Amino acid sequence: MPYGIYDLTHNQGYVYVGNSYDTPEFAAYAIAQWWADADRPRFRCEDKLLILADAGGSNNCRYWLWKQQVQEQLADQLGIVVMICHYPTGTSKWNPVEYSLFSQISRNWAGKPLCSWDIMLNFIRGTMTDTGLQVKAFLVDRTFEKQKKVTADERAALRLHPRPICPTWNYVIKPRPCTG
């Protein structure tokens, strides 16, 4: 299953294709891998990250595991503040990752049999547009456990700050202080 990241500023797509399960842990892992990619373009202020995400799927706005994994893999490990804005159900067609990245990938591989990881990755990497879209693709050969649970103590330990408008869909996760 693919997890896509679209950099609006640089018109670049990054697709992480997992051979395990589409889980919140996989979604956060893909974003952390993108952030760590030495070849990705840099931004002036890299102490914050804005994620525009669908309300469903592995980055579901109701999943505590998604929030916990963002806390651990992004905010804590990378030392960044992460603001997440979810698109309401049924509005994902307005999400740039859908109309600027996945729609182009779908056109590129339309009607082609995707019978191996290499073929799939090469079609994703070969996706380009007249506006200069470039796409990188990576295979994530790792098992992500389904149905992991987040305990009440783990929830309480999150540095989760809901935003005033639509707090279920818009929130900030801040790094926790290092304990040593």
Q: Model segments located where?
A:
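C-terminal accessory extensions appended to soluble enzyme cores
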Residues: 111-180
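Electropositive, glycine- and tryptophan-enriched low-complexity nucleic-acid-binding patches
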Residues: 1-52, 56-57
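Short, well-ordered loop/turn and helix-capping segments at boundaries between secondary-structure elements
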Residues: 76, 103, 107-111, 126
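Two-metal-ion acidic nuclease core segments, chiefly of the RNase H-like superfamily
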Residues: 66-84
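Extended hydrophobic secondary-structure segments that form protein cores and membrane-embedded regions
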Residues: 48-55, 84-89, 123-124
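Alpha-helical scaffold elements adjacent to nucleotide-binding pockets in ATP/GTP-utilizing enzyme cores
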Residues: 30, 34, 65-70, 100-105
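Acidic, metal-coordinating catalytic cores used for nucleic-acid/nucleotide bond scission
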Residues: 54-66, 88-94
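RNase H-like two-metal-ion nuclease catalytic core shared by retroviral integrases
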Residues: 84-106
